[in-house]
């Protein structure tokens, strides 16, 4: 821990808390996980990959092409908008999208990395006893998406070990 009395700006060394819920012994870079972050001036939570996970997202792209209705069904069952959950992350700029990919799945198809995050979080919720319930409901809402992606990550790990 840093002694702030010797710094010019007196800022704390650690100004936020980051919790991630992922499988034990799984490398962070390849991991799909839920997270919760609390900072001095922000708070958020969601689901996603730590970094770009090209193999897993390539599998998602193949699934979108092969079974768009199944992927849409999973996303619809999450009711992301109803829970104020929003897709974020970066997208490929020049990745060709097959004509068979429906318009509503194109952002998912083009994802280079992604996360689904709660938006509209108010800072005062950090002091509200309903916070745990809010986070739990959002995590449960994202569970179908987690299961879809988790299956893909597990398949990749099994393939790489074989």
Task: Locate predicted features.
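A short, surface-exposed loop/turn module that caps and links secondary-structure elements
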Residues: 1-13, 17, 82-97
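Generic detector of bulky aromatic hydrophobic side chains
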Residues: 25, 70-71, 136, 143
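General "foldedness" signal
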Residues: 14, 33-35, 50-52, 57-63, ...
